[in-house]
Swiss-Prot record:
GO terms for cellular component: plasma membrane. Its main location: membrane. This is Cobalamin biosynthesis protein CobD. GO terms for biological process: cobalamin biosynthetic process. Belongs to the CobD/CbiB family.
Length: 315
């Protein structure tokens, strides 16, 4: 199976996520919205509605790919492998992540701030209408660093150690967190369960990834010592138990400071500051972050394979 996952990564790097083709994540989102409406209308509490919605989405997201691969394997093992490759391909997003941040970079190179704000709004939830160039760069770097775990290394973790059905299960977990994991009036209770499950699912991959980011910064000639230092000093300051780790590692590697004031629907939100502002924000830091993300994705996958192979050998 490792070679199959490697092919999935290659397909993602070549094709990305074609917008005109059906995608499991969009189907998961539609299912989740329908179940949310049903259980909100038929449950005694928002917490129970959120738990039932989440568990049913998780179950369906696991069973469909699991049974599909089993059926394909019965027809021919090659069909099973091909289907597994395609399922895993849909759970990772290396190409899309790099492309989106590159679009922000291109707009900034053209000194087109309105376009850069529009492009960065596709990858962040904060208000972008009045962001300065430095704030756009910070938003782009923060989003890319955070999504390295959600969009790449965690689905690869479950693909390597569990297979395609587990990778899709994780994708459903992350999708529900994106839909419901907000601490506002509507989702504070309903979304608490999927948010906790997402934190749990990302816990180990986030920690592995953050240290591999330090290693990647060494190979790329960035400040790896500072990356390790900031990771250990600031990684746990973030409200999320996982997001701050990779953001801190990237901040240290690039010698910049992430976090600070953001606006969400006009409401000010202050995130802990990660890193020290040794350098001003520069457009090239977007490309440097992309290099870190790409190399870290490859090295993390190799690390997973080594652990999997070692465990298989001894067991």
């Amino acid at each position: 199976m490792p070679w199959g996952i490697a092919i999935s990564i290659l397909v993602d790097l070549i094709l990305g996520d074609p917008k005109d083709l059906p995608h499991p994540v969009r189907a998961i989102g539609k299912l989740a919205r329908a179940l949310e409406k049903f259980f909100r209308n038929n449950c005694s509490s928002e917490e129970i509605a959120g738990i039932l919605t989440s568990c049913l989405v998780y179950l369906i997201s696991f069973i469909i790919p699991f049974l599909s691969v089993q059926f394909a394997n019965q027809l021919h093992w090659i069909l099973g492998e091909l289907l597994s490759i395609m399922i895993i391909y849909t759970t990772i997003a290396i190409r899309d992540m790099i492309d989106h941040s590159k679009e922000v970079y291109d707009a900034l190179v053209q000194t087109n701030l309105p376009l850069a704000r529009k492009k960065v709004s596709k990858i962040v939830a904060r208000d972008t209408e009045n962001l300065s160039e430095s704030e756009i760069i910070r938003a782009c770097v923060e989003s890319t660093a955070e999504n390295l775990v959600d969009g790449i290394t965690t689905p690869l973790f479950y693909a390597v150690f569990g297979g395609p059905a587990w990778a899709m299960l994780y994708r459903s977990i992350n999708t529900l967190d994106s839909l419901f994991g907000y601490k506002n009036k509507k989702y504070l209770r309903f979304g608490s369960f999927p948010a906790r499950i997402d934190d749990l699912a990302n816990y180990l991959p986030a920690r592995i990834t953050s240290y591999i980011l330090v290693l990647s910064s060494l190979f790329l000639g960035y400040n790896f010592k500072n990356s390790l230092y900031i990771l250990q000093r600031d990684g746990k300051k973030h409200p999320s138990p996982n997001s701050g780790l990779t953001e801190a590692a990237v901040a240290g590697a690039l010698e910049i400071q992430l976090g600070g004031v953001n606006l969400y629907s006009g409401v000010q939100n202050i995130k802990p500051k990660l890193g020290d502002p040794k350098k001003e924000f520069q457009i090239e830091q977007i490309l440097q972050t992309n290099k870190l993300i790409l190399l870290s994705s490859i090295l993390t996958f190799i690390f997973y394979i080594l652990i999997y192979s070692g465990a298989a050998y001894f067991l």
